[in-house]
Curated annotation (Swiss-Prot):
Low complexity bias locations: 25-36, 755-771, 1163-1175
Biased composition (Polar residues): 1057-1074, 1143-1157, 1210-1222
Residues where Phosphoserine is found: 747, 757, 768, 994, 998, 1077, 1198, 1207
Annotated active site: 216, 219 (nucleophile), 354
Record protein name field: Deubiquitinating protein VCPIP1
Record EC number: 3.4.19.12
Modified how: Phosphorylated at Ser-1207 by ATM or ATR following induction of covalent DNA-protein cross-links (DPCs).
Species, as recorded: Homo sapiens (Human)
Reaction catalysed by this enzyme: Thiol-dependent hydrolysis of ester, thioester, amide, peptide and isopeptide bonds formed by the C-terminal Gly of ubiquitin (a 76-residue protein attached to proteins as an intracellular targeting signal)
Single GO term (MF): cysteine-type deubiquitinase activity
Highest taxon of the lineage: Eukaryota
The keyword DNA repair appears for this protein: yes
Keyword terms of this UniProt record: Acetylation, Cytoplasm, DNA damage, DNA repair, Endoplasmic reticulum, Golgi apparatus, Hydrolase, Nucleus, Phosphoprotein, Protease, Thiol protease, Ubl conjugation pathway
Length: 1222
């Protein structure tokens, strides 16, 4: 019977219920504000999971949902409940955590279902696995170890009557935890009226709530177990107790219910109690009222079953009070002598096929059930209610009680049972739960018995097929379908086609499947060798830090891997220990080479040295290390003690440090892998909240407790951390010399065997304590310089400007200071507030934009700094593989595009406001560097910024916007205005210059930039070139070109994204054989060429133009000797370019210059800007010198090439572009 909807007002939705008003001062409450403010609030907040066993770091938008789901334990918490909520101001954290994990939809560990949500480290499925053991085992109070109950003289089976006075009270912070707190199956709606009546009887306080239990056919015993201890730990014992109880008291039950239950039914009733009972087909699975009555007698306490108000008023047995009528009342009391208080369960829907428990809330008043909701007794006389339930004066009763099982005891009990589970099954229950989560639930397989999952998990571990990701913690299985390995299968056929006849003495490797197989000739199948096979990537997050798992759930670590053990004294700053050679260390070792020479034999070995361990016994002992090395390579050698002493001396020399903070650990890939659930150390959390010390792409120091990153990002973090320490050491000349690799001298005072007590450097331990009087700020200029500045808490705006001026030699009036995310300008204080401190926090980053009127001294310093940073950047990024750099660039571009979309802007409009993206370390800078390399004047375009061409400026070490008609412009928010102003000015100049230089304004012009063509009709149909903008031919700056180079062929390759020019060292570049009909190349933009038919030109018109060009060239060749002789007397050398310009302009009307030439000519210059400084003024000299060296035969077959010159066509619409130069 369906329940009609409740009358208005409408009930609050289950997730989440209305809570107390939030305080405006809280960051979390600010995040929950709605309306226009909510839409404009683009802040990103972070906080820690409040579960003490989890404490994962969570990131969420301020304008997002008011409840946050933990990515580690799966619980959902209100924002007010998160610990250490603070604003994240760094864009890198936002991109790599919010966008990558939430908006990008990157595959990660699957969302945890209700069975696997962990509270205090325990999930429902974990408890279900341990429940059968708890039915037979107890815990020895003295040893804390599990012991058989019969060995403790407590019988074979756990007596559930011992829980008769226990009651679970849920913690307020867990009320809304999915899978543990409030039930989400619809019971809140179905039981609304009933719960409202209970609420009114308890002074309008919500003190009795329905909580979740899994619907797996054991919901009644799950509900009772949760009502008793809060966990589903005792469902198995309750079923066995119930079955035993019915068997022992069957005669009394048959006599009591002979009018209602036939004698033949009792066998089925008892069988249904069995934990492994499987109902016949067509019979509904579940326990009935008679079983609830039996459980009340087992527990020696009443059980009250509630329903909706309409159900309770109906004539059906939908609600009842089940009394322990077969048990004497004096045995239904607790240790205090009072009657055991009833527990309460209810139906969750009108289908009445699922039980849920109703429990009280810890810290609130015990819930009271009013008299009008107390159902009638079931199966026994009504007057027994007063005998078994203590009624209040108003006729109601208290539910549950306050004798709860302590969490500490419960966890000890679980730990003891886990040991038994390991002994019985050879696998840890948490690993079985993970197998169920990742291999069954994710594929939609439900209803699989825990025994089957346990067996499957155990076999996977024994076969070495289980792997765990160190990043997201997900399990992955190396599994290959058996049919692939049999004849006709994918791998079988591949092996046979590659190797021919398969042999039993060979192994066959399949790298794409991460599999190594042997051949079984008897069965004619391939047999996987999982011991030699290794999974290379996580199936969920695709991270490469994947390790095999043992049966006890431990991970088979490799040297350098970060473990789950906390570290309090590590210099690396990650807060966790590292695995090395079977032990866990606070730090990674330092590595240095050593050479052993003995008996004419030379051996080179690497020594791994531990020196800063909090446990001094783990520090390396120089004599032990030396002895092991000598014994390893020269075992049993007589007199090797001398070699040992030599090795000791060498090691002491290598490990002696002048600076105690010199710590350069070995670089291990994945050693500082970012993981979900990492948190800051307790020392850091005990301080006042500080910003996360994560600065920009070039200088960021990633906090490992707060990020979930890919392999590329982790590697960059490690390398940039090293770079930051190097840059700090540049401040003194002495440390500069050490950085360049000068040999360190041994100082006896610095030789030590024990751990160092010196504190870690700030960059190595970004979370190290800083005094409240100082704050360190990372400053980056738009020309690539950077520095860490220490400010006092009282530093004002003008004092900050002075600090910047001292550090970077930038006058205050040229400083534009930006901070925050998105970057906003830090304005000078208003009148009367000059003494106010600047609103910067410890760890913030600010960017200095240097205004245009920058002094020469500042430019010189910038160039020097840019050069220095560039060299260090090469040293850092040189360690990364090209694949990793490509992956990093793709991820950052993807994040940038999504963030721009969220901001409501296109990518260019958003990116031009972030100039650092076009500077060293920025994403566009990195893409160009990775794709084509960096060379001064080299042009490129990006697919994400259509219609924009960029050029590399080596002096400033940045990319600039290239506008053919106007020049190069530094990227900034106002770059579009600068371009418009420059284009307008150039157009005006171009109009005048164009009309003066040629009386004919045809389709082709020859100016100082070469031949240009009007493209007003076709230009909008041309796709911009997206490859490299290399220089064409010889880009020599000398106007007197090599005569031999002029005889080489034209460099012509149709460019599809690769270099279409040869290097200047090649003397015979490849020739492009042009076809007059369809293979003509026309240059339409810097680095852009296209076919003639693509431009839709008339072939006849082009042929006519080609002939005119041939006539022009022939005329020039015939008159060249006379022209050179008369040059000095008839005209000045500077008149020659103008005269040739007029000739070409009046003769050549359209078409491509190179197809009209009888010979091939080398090309000079490259995709340079139209207003770049070329050798225009020396054209005459170049022509004179060049033609003077030619022989008469050469004059008949070739023409002098012209240098690149500027050209503007006043009649072109909006733009002009240079053609290839001849």
């Amino acid at each position: 019977m369906s329940q009609p909807p409740p009358p208005p007002p409408p009930l609050p939705p289950p997730p989440p219920p209305p809570e107390a008003p939030q305080t405006p001062s809280s960051l979390a409450s600010a995040a929950a504000s709605g309306g226009l403010l909510k839409r404009r609030d683009r802040r990103i907040l972070s906080g820690s999971c409040p579960d003490p066993k989890c404490q994962a770091r969570l990131f969420f938008p301020a304008s997002g949902s008011v409840s946050i789901e933990c990515t580690e334990c799966g619980q959902r918490h209100e924002q007010q409940q998160l610990l250490g909520v603070e604003e994240v101001t760094d864009p890198d954290v936002v991109l790599h955590n919010l966008l990558r994990n939430a908006l990008l939809g990157v595959t990660g560990a699957p969302k945890k279902n209700t069975e696997l949500v962990k509270v205090m480290g325990l999930s429902n499925y974990h408890c279900k696995l341990l429940s059968p053991i708890l039915a037979r085992y107890g815990m020895d109070k003295q040893t804390g170890r599990a012991k058989l109950l019969r060995d403790m003289n407590q019988g074979e089976l756990f007596d559930c009557a011992l829980l008769g006075d226990r009651a679970f009270l849920i913690e307020p912070e867990h009320v809304n935890t999915v899978g543990y707190g409030k039930d989400r199956s619809g019971s809140l709606l179905y039981l609304h009226d009933t719960l409202e009546d209970i609420k009114r009887a308890n002074k309008s306080q919500e003190c009795l709530i329905p909580v979740h239990v899994d619907g797996d056919g054991h919901c009644l015993v799950h509900a009772v177990s949760r009502a008793l201890v809060g966990r589903e730990l005792f469902w198995h014992a309750l079923r066995e107790n119930l079955k035993q109880h019915f068997q022992q008291h069957l005669a009394r039950y048959q006599a009591l219910f002979h009018d209602f239950i036939d004698a033949a039914e009792w066998e089925d009733i008892i069988n249904e109690c069995d934990p492994l009972f499987v109902p016949p087909e067509g019979v509904p699975l579940g326990l009935r009222n008679i079983h609830i009555f039996g459980l009340a007698n087992v527990l020696h306490r009443p059980i009250i079953l509630l329903d909706s108000l309409s159900g309770m008023r109906s004539s059906g047995d939908y609600s009842a009070t089940f009394l322990p009528g077969l048990i004497p009342a004096e045995k239904c009391t607790g240790k205090d002598g009072h009657l055991n208080k009833p527990i309460c369960i209810a139906w969750s829907s009108s289908g009445r096929n699922h039980y849920i428990p109703l429990v009280g809330i810890k810290g609130a008043a015990l819930p009271k059930l009013p008299m009008n909701l107390l159902p009638k007794a079931w199966g026994v006389p009504q007057d027994l209610i007063k005998k078994y339930i203590k009624l209040e004066e108003d006729g109601g009763c208290v539910i549950g009680g306050d004798r709860s099982l302590q969490d500490k005891y419960l966890l000890r009990l679980v730990a003891a049972m886990e040991e038994v589970f390991m002994d019985k099954h050879g696998i840890h229950p948490s690993l079985v739960a993970d197998v169920h989560q990742y291999f069954y639930r994710r594929t939609g397989v439900i209803g699989v018995q825990p025994e089957e999952v346990t067996a499957a998990a155990k076999k996977a571990v024994m076969d070495n097929r289980l792997h765990k990701c160190l990043l997201c913690g997900a399990l992955s299985e190396l599994h290959v379908p058996p049919e692939w390995l049999a004849p006709g299968g994918k791998l079988y056929n591949l092996a046979k086609s590659t190797h021919g006849q398969l042999r039993t003495d060979k192994n066959y490797s399949f790298p794409l499947n991460n599999l190594v197989c042997s051949y079984d000739s008897v069965k004619d199948v391939l047999v996987p060798d999982y011991g030699m096979s290794n999974l290379t990537a996580c199936n969920w997050c695709h991270g490469t830090s994947v390790r095999k798992v043992r049966g006890d759930g431990s991970i088979v670590y490799l040297d350098g891997d970060r473990t789950n053990s906390r570290s309090t004294g590590g210099k690396c700053g990650c807060g966790f220990k590292h695995f090395w050679d079977g032990k866990e260390y606070d730090n990674l070792p330092e590595a240095f080479p050593i050479t052993l020479e003995w008996g004419g034999r030379v051996v080179r070995e690497t020594v791994y040295w531990f020196q800063y361990e909090s446990d001094s016994s783990l520090n390396s002992n120089v004599y032990d290390v030396a002895m092991k090395l000598v014994t390893k390579h020269f075992p049993g050698e007589f007199g090797s003690e001398i070699l040992v002493q030599k090795v000791v001396h060498t090691i002491l020399h290598q490990t002696a440090k002048k600076n105690p903070d010199d710590y350069t650990p070995v670089n291990i890939d994945g050693a500082h892998a970012q993981r979900v659930g990492d948190v800051q150390g307790q020392e850091s959390e005990s301080q006042l909240p500080t910003k996360i010390i994560l600065t920009g792409q070039k200088t960021k120091t990633l906090h490992k407790e707060e990020l979930n990153m890919s392999k590329t990002e982790r590697t960059i973090q490690q390398n940039i951390t090293e770079q930051a320490s190097v840059m700090q050491k540049r401040k003194t000349e002495k440390l500069k010399q050490e950085q360049k690799g000068q040999p360190r001298t041994v100082s006896p005072s610095t030789i030590r065997d024990g751990p160092s007590s010196a504190p870690a450097t700030p960059t190595k331990a970004p979370y190290s304590p800083t005094t409240s009087k100082e704050k360190k700020i990372r400053i980056t200029t738009n020309d690539g310089r950077q520095s860490m500045v220490t400010l006092k808490s009282s530093t004002t705006f003008f004092e900050l400007q002075e600090s910047i001026a001292r550090e970077f030699n930038i006058p205050p009036y040229l400083q534009c200071i930006r901070y925050g995310f998105p970057p906003k300008e830090l304005m000078p204080p208003q009148a009367g507030m000059e003494k106010e401190p600047v609103p910067l926090q410890h760890g913030d980053r600010i960017t200095i934009e240097i205004l245009k009127s920058k002094a020469e001294g500042g430019q010189s310093a910038a160039a020097h700094s840019a050069h220095t940073v560039k060299q260090e950047d090469i040293a850092v990024t040189g360690k990364l593989s090209s694949k990793e750099l490509q992956e990093q660039a793709e991820k950052e571009m993807y994040s940038l595009c999504l963030l721009a979309t969220l901001m409501g802007e296109d990518v260019w409009s958003y990116a031009k406001g972030l100039p650092h993206m076009f500077q060293q370390g920025g994403v566009f800078y990195s893409i160009m560097k990775k794709t084509m390399g960096m060379a001064d004047g080299k042009h490129c375009t990006f697919p994400h910024l259509p219609g924009k061409t960029f050029v590399y400026n080596a002096s400033e070490d940045r990319l600039e916007l290239c506008v053919d008609a106007a020049g190069h412009f530094p990227i900034g928010p106002d770059v579009e205005d600068l371009v418009k102003e420059a284009v307008s000015q150039v157009r005006a100049e171009a109009t005048t210059r164009s009309r003066e230089s040629s009386p004919s304004h045809g389709l082709l012009k020859l100016g100082s930039g070469g031949v240009v063509k009007k493209k007003s009709e076709q230009l909008h149909n041309v796709t911009a070139f997206q490859g490299k903008g290399h220089s064409l031919g010889t880009a020599s700056g000398n106007p007197h070109l090599d005569p031999r180079a002029r005889e080489t062929s034209v460099v012509r390759k149709h460019n599809t994204g690769t270099d279409f020019s040869n290097s200047s060292t090649k003397t015979e570049p490849s020739v492009f054989t042009a076809s007059s009909s369809n293979s003509e190349l026309i240059r339409i933009a810097p680095g852009v060429v296209t076919m003639r038919d693509g431009r839709q030109l008339d072939p006849d018109l082009v042929e006519a133009q080609r002939k005119k060009l041939q006539e022009m060239v022939s005329s020039i060749q015939a008159s060249m000797d006379r022209h050179l002789r008369d040059q000095s007397t008839e005209q000045s050398p500077s008149d020659l370019p103008q005269r040739k310009t007029e000739v070409v302009s009046s003769s050549a009307k359209s078409g491509s210059l190179q197809t009209g030439l009888p010979e091939s000519f080398p090309l000079t210059g490259g995709t340079e800007n139209l207003n770049t400084e070329t050798t225009d003024g020396c054209v005459a000299d170049a022509l004179g010198a060049a033609f003077a060296t030619r022989s008469k035969a050469q004059r008949g077959n070739s023409v002098e090439e012209l240098e690149e010159m500027d050209s503007q066509d006043a009649e072109m619409t909006n733009t002009t572009e240079p053609m290839d130069h001849s």
